[in-house]
UniProtKB/Swiss-Prot annotation:
Residues 113-129 have a biased composition (Pro residues). GO terms for cellular component: cytoplasm; cytosol; peptidoglycan-based cell wall; plasma membrane. One of the essential components for the initiation of protein synthesis. Protects formylmethionyl-tRNA from spontaneous hydrolysis and promotes its binding to the 30S ribosomal subunits. Also involved in the hydrolysis of GTP during the formation of the 70S ribosomal complex. The lineage of its organism: Bacteria, Bacillati, Actinomycetota, Actinomycetes, Mycobacteriales. Gene3D superfamilies: 1.10.10.2480, P-loop containing nucleotide triphosphate hydrolases, Translation factors, Translation initiation factor IF- 2, domain 3. Residues 509-512 are annotated as: G4. It comes from Mycobacterium tuberculosis (strain ATCC 25618 / H37Rv). The keyword Zinc does not apply. This is Translation initiation factor IF-2. One of its GO terms (biological process) is translational initiation.
Length: 900
């Protein structure tokens, strides 16, 4: 290459080294070059050539080069080449040049001879040719650096070399290069290049058979320098005798860089025919792994050794691929070929993960939510469910009693009688919609004892809530109506209590009604393992009348006696509080409010608490009477204010040291919950079902909003359990606690969904947006009405119904009392019209307080009017006493309409 500016890769090609080595040498010289395509100045290029040429010391006369890093590397490569050839990678008759093409080098002794040895030729063995060169071979002349493209037949590294081609004559030397047979200055006398076609000293006999092509044009001496990363050969090692080629120009001794030998593409550099040398260890390993890998769906996947892979429920293929160090795209393609359409980030069901793992010889273990949550807490050095300390730290706590039974058998009436309060009338339809927890004081043998009661719904839709109540309780009171007998939910309550290993006290209610037969109830319950004490069993039966208050004290005494006899109710009050969230709802003024039951430890105001995927700091605690509580001891139910979001009903709560820890635990639980929900609710589409999936199907999308988390969960479980035809699909795309917002309406509009509001109403702008977007919002206050209508809608068996037409809204500004008409509400009509005798409902913070009211009287100033329009004040009566300033009255009328 002519002197002057040159690019780095051109210099590397000229010097016979890689661009990376040239860049490293330039960096050592203080020249910082950016890339291999950068240009260097002429002085820099000259110094670089001198550096590569001068770095190779001239071999002493008759003395091999000192062993160093280069000989070790070349020796390893030569050994690898010999092993490959012995294993069948090369032919037994391959020339030493062939071995050199496979990446091998001449094997030299690692020791330096003390005295020069006479040049002798060693005849090669026809069985196992040695890849080394004759030690007496003379080096060839060093031509001027430049680029020379040899003929096809002149490439000693080409596998297509003809065996019977005559040995070509060596090319004539170019001007400026040493002539053949003339030693370079500083070179050893025995390093003359071999004569074409001749042997050294005539000591090498001709090889039988066809003549071989010449050896690789090797460099006299060391070949490439150590810095160049080339193969190392001792001094005096050149081309094999009889090859007709001179050794590789350049290299050691003279210090001038040699040119590339062989055709373009030799030594792994670009150009020429593709290299067909020895595979690297990495390539061999990859080929071996691919041969061993199992084929699943036409795709080669990693092969396991029976290892156990732990995956969370709802994990994706990306999560699985990370565990086994595989490509997620390969897993996706394998499932696609097997008829399963799943993306890499999509949650996958347990069966699919286990099947895919078994095909690859992996034991996939889907971690249960309980185990996963326990591992999560252990990562923060936390534990749940055990009392800290020893026996001396445990103190007696009140029993937690759950009232269970069939719907309308009198559970809430019994609790009313015990609490001396009337909470039954607040439930729509007289049916308990959510769980309530209360603590009452009972006199027993002159001492005051505390009992905590949990009221659970009896309707069939609340199975999950009854199961949670059984898990959080110590004793179960089974209420059975004496005139009705054992019903399906009665049997279910028995199963929940027995599954939780909870003692049962049976309260035979309504003994004051006609047709009551307590003896019949005892006989029926005997079939389910509840044998009365009078029959020789261990279950206490108490005949009561919740309405008349008969034998209530006897029932309380039976509860305490059962607790003292069968249970060891003790807890450590000196540890961080732990317990369970009984219910939770969103209050407009106070934010998320959760009713929690402290099971162990002491809960205090200011504690950092986490419950499920909600966290926060306890800002305020309120008991069942609305009074503030500073400290909550074990078995104490309180309302906790301070959560950042609404906890789920039945979620475990515990106190942690810092808000940061609570937030991290809640975030991880939230992500796990989303994945599990996506894996459970998403229906997979297989290739066999693709044709039917592309057809138009009847799908009902729902958005559920309720006043508390337990009710929303129960409603969703009941709706998803409706059995309909396969052509009709029910899908819940969102659920939440609180009023219906604009976000819910926008989601419903985008997904063609119907919004179900349970004991909640839509906000003002949300109603307008729903009307504008054509989104249907349906309101319910009794759960079985919602279930029945949704089921009828899915089955297409709906009869003509009455559609609600909203008339207007009015805000209560003042209250007046009258001896004639009772409580009068002074209102300002904010929208629409208020009409006399119209239906109305009372809202407080968008929560339905009263339903099915009627505007009995309506006055404007002192005149009786039939309606009052938007922007005017009026006075009206509803026939309902529990109204407050700030409440909203919503008037509506029912219009009969045919369903589509």
């Amino acid at each position: 290459m002519a002197a002057g500016k040159a690019r780095v890769h051109e210099l590397a090609k000229e010097l016979g080294v890689t661009s990376k080595e040239v860049l490293a040498r330039l960096s050592e010289q203080g020249e910082f070059v950016k890339s291999a395509s950068s240009t260097v100045e002429a002085p820099v290029a000259r110094r670089l050539r001198e550096s590569f040429g001068g770095s190779k010391p001239a071999p002493a006369k008759g003395t091999a080069k000192s062993p160093g890093k280069g000989p070790d590397k070349s020796l390893d490569k030569a050994l690898d080449a010999a092993i490959d050839m012995a294993a069948g990678n090369g032919k037994a008759t391959a020339a030493p040049a062939k071995a050199a093409d496979s990446g091998g080098a001449a094997i030299v002794s690692p020791t330096t001879p003390a005295a020069p040895e006479p040049p002798t030729a060693v005849p090669p063995s026809p069985q196992a040719p040695h890849p080394g060169m004759a030690p007496g071979a003379r080096p060839g002349p060093v031509p001027k650096p430049g680029i020379r493209t040899p003929r096809v037949g002149n490439n000693p590294f080409s596998s297509a070399q003809p065996a019977d081609r005559p040995i070509p004559r060596p090319p004539a030397p170019r001007p400026g290069t040493a002539r053949p047979g003339v030693p370079r200055p500083g070179a050893s006398p025995g390093s003359m290049p071999p004569r074409p076609g001749g042997a050294v000293g005539g000591a090498r006999p001709p090889r039988p058979g066809a003549p071989r092509p010449g050896g690789r044009p090797g460099a006299p001496g060391a070949g490439r320098s150590d810095a160049g990363g080339g193969n190392y050969r001792g001094g005096g090692v050149g081309a094999a005798p009889g090859t007709g080629f001179r050794g590789r120009p350049g290299g050691g001794g003279g210090g001038r860089p040699g040119q590339r030998g062989g055709a373009a593409g030799a030594f792994g550099r670009p150009g020429g025919a593709p290299r067909r040398g020895r595979k690297s260890k990495r390539q061999k390993r990859q080929e071996y792994d691919s041969m061993q890998a199992p084929v699943v769906g036409g795709v080669r996947l990693p092969h396991g050794n029976g290892e156990t892979i732990r995956l969370a429920r709802g994990a994706s293929l990306s999560d699985f691929a990370d565990k086994i160090d595989a490509n997620p795209a390969a897993l996706v393609q394998a499932l696609f070929n097997l008829g399963e359409m799943v993306t890499a980030t999509q949650s996958v069901g347990d069966e699919t993960l286990e099947l895919l793992g078994s095909e690859m010889n992996y034991n996939v273990q889907v971690v249960s939510p309980e185990d996963e949550d326990r591992e999560l807490l252990e990562s923060f050095d936390l534990s749940y469910g055990e009392d800290e300390g020893g026996e001396e730290d445990l103190q007696v706590r009140p029993p937690v009693v759950t009232v269970m039974g069939h719907v309308d058998h009198g559970k809430t009436r019994l609790l009313d009688t015990i609490r001396k309060a009337n909470v039954r009338e607040a439930e729509a339809g007289g049916i308990t919609q959510h769980i309530g927890a209360y603590q009452v004081a009972v006199d027993l043998d002159g001492s005051q004892r505390l009992i905590t009661f949990i009221d659970t719904p009896g309707h069939e839709a609340f199975t999950a809530m009854r199961a949670r109540g059984a898990k959080a309780t110590d004793i179960a009171i089974l209420v059975v109506a004496a005139d009705d007998g054992v019903m399906p939910q009665t049997v279910e309550a028995i199963n929940h209590a027995q599954a939780a290993d909870v003692p049962i006290v049976v309260a035979v209610n309504k003994i004051d009604k006609e047709g009551a037969d307590p003896a019949k109830i005892r006989g029926q319950l005997t079939e389910y393992g509840l044998v009365p004490e009078e029959f020789g069993g261990d279950t206490m039966f108490v005949d009561i009348s919740a309405k008349q208050g008969t034998n209530i004290e006897a029932l309380e005494e039976a509860v305490l006696l059962t607790a003292d006899a069968a249970l060891d109710l003790r807890a450590n009050p000196d540890m961080e509080a732990q317990g369970v969230a009984i219910e939770a709802h969103l209050d407009r003024g106070r934010g998320p409010v959760a009713t929690v039951l402290v099971q162990r430890g002491t809960l205090r105001v200011g504690d950092s608490v986490v419950a499920g995927d909600a966290y926060g700091r306890v800002r305020r605690m309120v008991d069942e009477h609305g009074e503030d509580v500073e400290v909550a001891l074990p078995s104490r139910p309180v309302q906790v204010i301070g959560f950042t979001s609404v906890p789920g009903a039945g979620d475990n709560f515990l106190v942690v040291d810092e808000d940061r820890i609570a937030r991290q635990i809640a975030d991880r639980r939230s992500a796990r919950k989303r994945n599990a929900l996506a894996a459970r609710s998403r229906k997979r589409i297989s290739l066999e079902d693709l044709d039917s999936a592309l057809k138009e199907t009847s799908q009902l999308n729902l958005i559920l909003k309720g006043d508390n988390a337990g009710t929303v969960e129960a409603l969703e479980e009941a709706l998803m359990g409706i059995q309909v035809d396969d052509e009709v699909v029910l899908r819940v795309i969102d659920r939440g606690v609180g009023g219906i917002t604009e976000t819910n309406v926008n989601l419903a509009s985008a997904s063609d969904a119907v919004i179900i509001g349970f004991n909640v109403r839509a906000e003002g702008k949300a109603t307008e947006l729903a009307s504008r977007e054509g989104v249907e919002i349906r309101y319910y206050s009794v759960i079985y009405q919602a279930i029945d209508e949704i089921e009828q809608a899915l089955r297409g068996l709906l009869k003509p119904i009455y559609e609600e037409n909203q008339l207007g809204r009015a805000e209560i500004r003042a209250l007046f009392r009258s001896s004639k008409v009772g409580l009068i509400a002074g209102c300002l009509v904010t929208s629409g019209v208020m009409r006399r005798n119209a239906k109305a409902r009372l809202l407080r913070d968008n929560i339905v307080v009263a339903e099915n009211l009627s505007i009995a009287s309506l006055r404007r100033e002192k005149d009786d009017v039939t309606e009052v329009r938007d922007g005017f004040e009026c006075g009206l009566t509803l026939g309902y006493a529990d109204i407050k300033e700030g409440d909203v009255i919503e008037s509506y009328e029912l219009v009969q309409k045919e369903r589509a």
